[in-house]
């Protein structure tokens, strides 16, 4: 018996049968062991018996029973599973005879299945006879599966019914109602039909960005085939979507993948043009299976495509088409391109309206039309790195899922009451142990309170459950309508006019009437009373999801946020002292953006802050970030002194291809891509190389920039602040009592214009001059710094108060108009914080104490009170 004459699956079956015999402590490998393995592991054996209409479960029971009857030999030195039984030898010899009869090159699984029928006393044959199955019937089933193929390779079993194994029948899926409806895209579908109807080169390839609906076009074609809304040549055709993953998966040996693909192509060829093969992500076929000098899968397609034996529809993205298919001119020539553009916002709304019902049925919610319009427009405006309609469909789906989760989980109000009941029950159990009068009185009060809470919890629970059941009932009726409509479509396609008339004029209107009554009743109840559950998906839910994905607040302004925005200028005035004009201009820009009246094609605001060092330019940017986002993390700070050389400019948008760091992206572009709603602070811009400003031109004008990877980065939701010290010497010398004269402003602007190009300055919203700080401003800053120190000491519960004399002394001593507020910080650290720290460490100032800081003979004194 030559094992090389067996297919790999038969060889594996014998090896597994031996392992089974060893595990079961059987001395010999028998036919029963082989069939136990075949019935559990071989897809072909199960399929053959299924086609022959054998009761496989009954057969498996017989095999298991027979296995249990084989005697178990135990003891030391026993060799398990080392010999083949006489019956198994006979089976192998009979299988070889079957192989010769069928004119095959190798012994495969089907020969074993046929050979066992010659062993009349074998339990398997006895069971099959009991089920009235003859060898002839099983042989017919095998020939049906083989479809005229011979066993010419050691992987033969892998290649039977290849299309069923490695593909999905889209037309069958449409008939069973598994696919969503395809709305629009009529021009592209017509184009595909036109190409498919050609005599030669009748292979369209759909090219478009990811998410624009390439696969949906093929699904739309399948739906048209089912509706018979196609030319005569395409009627009754089948579209098989090839699953590349399952085609490649498990192909262990060289050539196995090609063999599977060849089997698929052979089946398509034998169908005489009845099967249209759809290969999604067709670029994966080009080069698949290619090893040194080996022929790849793409080359296997070429001859069949050229001869018109293969009707193929491909789909791939623009980048991958260029990268893989355009390089292979011979393959590209055999395909006809169909460009699939991104749909407009209006088209996307139509697509969403068509899918609305499917989402409502799946999630059991009610979607408002304004939610669909919001999904299309907001996704187009804020989610710039993806394409319509995919991103809009995802938004609607996630908003529906959010509402569904809220319906299914316990409402927060009920959850609170339930927790309160649990807390009181624990307290009650503890008080029952106490016997003193005070505890008994407390117990009595607690029991009354507990009874009230329990009653409230029960009321809320019953209300929640009744609302939930109402929503479920509406969902069930919607599902029923969907099922009836699908039946109607099927009846019309099959020309079953009686059934179609009964459904159209009888069943469907009756169920629709029931749904209308339920929805009306539900709406009336909602209007009359406060509902615990919300089942409506509105534009607010969509805006919330956009905010969650991008970090950009697009929801309608709530009361708390209105207050915060209106008071933004006042809050910034407290943080940045003495720069009223700058604060007002920045807060106005944020206000315009949040009210939705800013130019949607430009950043929220772009400013140049000019002024001497230490007057609050960077501090204002930090304060704005803190007030807009409650943290300074949303501020992207880039020190322009790092971009002084020409070659360092590329670091902003990423290194060019071929250079180190190309994959990492740019420091500015990556930061904004991850955080599209943020403040971009470009510190000390006069230190940067002039080429940096060329990059910033389109950012300031169009709110967008292309990084080194070719991605479009959106700056439309950023505040761009640039700081500079240009003209600070003039501001220091000629500012009178904190006011900047028009002449001084004009002189500073002239210096600025000599430093920067006019096209750069012209694109900035505002150039703001920061005034040098006066002594009065410095006193205000002392207050602020003392407050910050107080916050740092709050952890140790130490409170400090500082006398007016001490504050005035600090302001006078530390005031230097040239250096602004920074010397003030240094002075407080040296003369207040350091002595204070020494007192705390020495134990003179303990936690929970108050410290009064005063001035005596130009020295600071610390008076501690408990």
Curated annotation (Swiss-Prot):
Keyword Chaperone set for record: yes
Residues reported in the UniProt entry to bind ATP 1: 208-215
Sequence segments annotated as region (C-terminal): 773-866
Coiled coil: 393-527
GO molecular function: ATP binding; ATP hydrolysis activity
Compartment(s): Cytoplasm
One Gene Ontology biological process: cellular response to heat
Region described as Repeat 2: spans on this chain: 84-148
Keyword Protein transport: no
Region of interest called NBD1, as start-end residue ranges on this chain: 161-342
Primary localization: cytoplasm
Repeat 1: annotated segments: 6-70
Span of domain Clp R: 3-148
Similarity comment: Belongs to the ClpA/ClpB family.
Subunit structure comment from the entry: Homohexamer. The oligomerization is ATP-dependent.
Name of protein: Chaperone protein ClpB
Gene name, Swiss-Prot/TrEMBL: clpB
